[in-house]
């Protein structure tokens, strides 16, 4: 996984330095958690992190079409009409014919928000773009639910990501195939506690 960090023209230089450093630090943490190579690199990025302000909307739409030339109209419509109440989002694009195998992701983080909110968006959207996309009210304590109780990646979230990236699991496995493996990994991570 290679994160590419890009900024809209309206984003001040000092903010760019802070946001890039937050993505770099978080990428290192995600790599440690998942035991998967994750880095920040402009070259050949497959996960694009766009910090764009409202004034950068046209630039953002153009850039998204460059990244994913065949983006479906529904995804473009979401980006074109994103309501101001949405602070950030991630859209993941799967390999052809395999919806469980992400090949490209784009996270959009509104640049005009305060630093802590942008950092929270980095944590949530980059983790979701790694494959834990569904928000669930049963995921607690977690950033993977919509109650906004937790803003930064929790130990529980780290365990979920570690399970997801365990080499014993493969993209496209059925729940029936994956369930006993997931249970075993969870027991290993928690020392057998349930």
Give each language-model segment a name.
Residues 1-23:
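N-terminal Sec/ER secretory leader and immediately downstream segment
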Residues 1-8, 38-60, 146-147:
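Acidic helix-start/capping segments at beta-turn-to-alpha-helix junctions
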Residues 15-38:
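Zn2+-dependent metallopeptidase catalytic core
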Residues 67-117, 133-194:
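Metalloprotease/metallohydrolase-associated module, dominated by Zn2+-dependent proteases
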Residues 1-2, 25, 33-35, 43-46, ...:
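Extracytoplasmic
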Residues 120-133:
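Active-site recognition of the HExxH zinc-binding catalytic motif
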Residues 13-14, 58-59, 116-120:
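Extracytoplasmic/secreted cell-surface and envelope-processing proteins
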Residues 61-66:
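A contiguous, low-structure linker/loop signature
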């Amino acid at each position: 996984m290679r994160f590419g960090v890009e900024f809209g023209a309206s984003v001040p230089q000092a903010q760019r330095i802070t946001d890039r450093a937050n993505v770099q630090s978080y990428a290192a943490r995600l790599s440690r958690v998942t035991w998967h190579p994750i880095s920040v690199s402009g070259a050949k990025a497959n996960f694009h992190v766009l910090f764009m302000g409202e004034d950068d909307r046209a630039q953002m739409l153009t850039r998204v079409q460059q990244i994913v030339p065949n983006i479906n109209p529904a995804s473009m419509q979401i980006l074109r009409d994103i309501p101001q109440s949405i602070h950030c989002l991630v859209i993941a694009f799967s390999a052809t014919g395999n919806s469980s195998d992400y090949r490209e992701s784009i996270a959009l983080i509104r640049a005009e928000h305060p630093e802590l909110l942008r950092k929270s968006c980095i944590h949530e959207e980059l983790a979701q773009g790694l494959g834990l996309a569904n928000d669930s009210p049963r995921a607690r304590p977690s950033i993977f639910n919509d109650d906004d109780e937790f803003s930064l990646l929790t130990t529980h979230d780290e365990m979920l990501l570690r399970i997801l990236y365990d080499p014993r699991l493969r993209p496209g496995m059925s729940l029936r195939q994956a369930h006993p493996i997931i249970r075993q990994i969870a027991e290993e991570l928690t020392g057998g506690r349930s």
